[in-house]
Amino acid sequence: MSQISSLRHITVLLDEAVAALNVRADGRYLDGTFGRGGHSRLLLQQLGPNGQLLGFDKDPLAIATGQALAAEDGRFVVVQRSFAELGDEVAQRGWTGAVSGILLDLGVSSPQLDDPIRGFSFLNDGPLDMRMDPSRGVSAAEWIASADEDEIARVFKDYGEERFAKRMARAVVQRRAEAPFERTADLAKVLTDANPAWEKGKSPATRAFQGLRIHINNELGDLERGLDAALDALEVGGRLVVISFHSLEDRIVKQFMRRHAKGEADKLPRDLPIIPKAFEPRLKLIGKPQYASEAEVKANPRSRSAVMRVAEKVR
């Protein structure tokens, strides 16, 4: 078994997420982050013969797994696209406003993190790439080679929430003048040496690597586009289930769901007798945020930071 094929992914909040979708046997569902198919497989078990499931992923290895599943089960189709583009895909299929549930499991999968060739991790040395789809866009090495010091600092600070972002960016620019960054371990060492206050139990390079990965893949921009598209794609009564893994993602999801659950009546004159439909809430929040259980965290430490939020379309 090759190193890549042996890499395993443990699906986070598996039962909870599929239960939150409130699966209808004949419904149409979207798995916006297919990954290695954990959520999709369980969802298919709950669909009847007329149910349909459409999976999205940018990662070519995830697509290969999805195509194998599609060959086994005719109710499932997978496309190599970001979930940010789900609106276009849904429209092409005539599903706009007719999707029963959408699941987004954000972040990077274990196979991506653990495979040195992908360049996501400082723990396993590999090419400094970080792209979810290696055939598209600019690699982390290419971006680090050309970005100015202020831009590097902004990415580390805004997306990695790294308080020593300026100091780290300065170290990166000074070092690249001598030789380009090509390996993850090389960048990690420079970042580690530039961080004067290590957090217990966390590598000094963790936050900067997170910020770089988010920027390279436009993760927050994709999330905002994907949430807007998901709301339009859902039918009334359809569920949106989102699992996030860091505060930046969760803040976007929380604010999106709250904004659409509140509506925009506060923008209208107070004495208006009837609230126009365009200003009424489009979502209602379902339950409280859910977190991985102690047992799940023990079995899969990467689930510790997971937060799941659920909303239902009402208009």
UniProtKB/Swiss-Prot annotation:
Cellular localisation: Cytoplasm
Sequence positions that bind S-adenosyl-L-methionine: G37, G38, H39, D57, F83, D105, Q112
A Gene Ontology biological process term: rRNA base methylation
Gene Ontology terms for molecular function: rRNA (cytosine-N4-)-methyltransferase activity
Keyword Hydrolase: no
Annotated EC: 2.1.1.199
Catalytic activities: cytidine(1402) in 16S rRNA + S-adenosyl-L-methionine = N(4)-methylcytidine(1402) in 16S rRNA + S-adenosyl-L-homocysteine + H(+)
SUPFAM superfamilies linked: Putative methyltransferase TM0872, insert domain (SSF81799), S-adenosyl-L-methionine-dependent methyltransferases (SSF53335)
Highest taxon in the source lineage: Bacteria
Assigned keywords, A-Z: Cytoplasm, Methyltransferase, rRNA processing, S-adenosyl-L-methionine, Transferase
Residues making up the signal peptide according to the UniProt record: none
Region of interest called Disordered, as start-end residue ranges on this chain: 296-315
Entries under InterPro entries matching the protein: RsmH, SAM-dep_MeTrfase_MraW_recog, SAM-dependent_MTases_sf
Chief localization: cytoplasm
Class of the enzyme per the UniProt entry, highest EC level: transferase
GO cellular component term of the entry, any: cytoplasm
Protein family according to the UniProt entry: Belongs to the methyltransferase superfamily. RsmH family.
Function: Specifically methylates the N4 position of cytidine in position 1402 (C1402) of 16S rRNA.
Protein's name according to its UniProt entry: Ribosomal RNA small subunit methyltransferase H
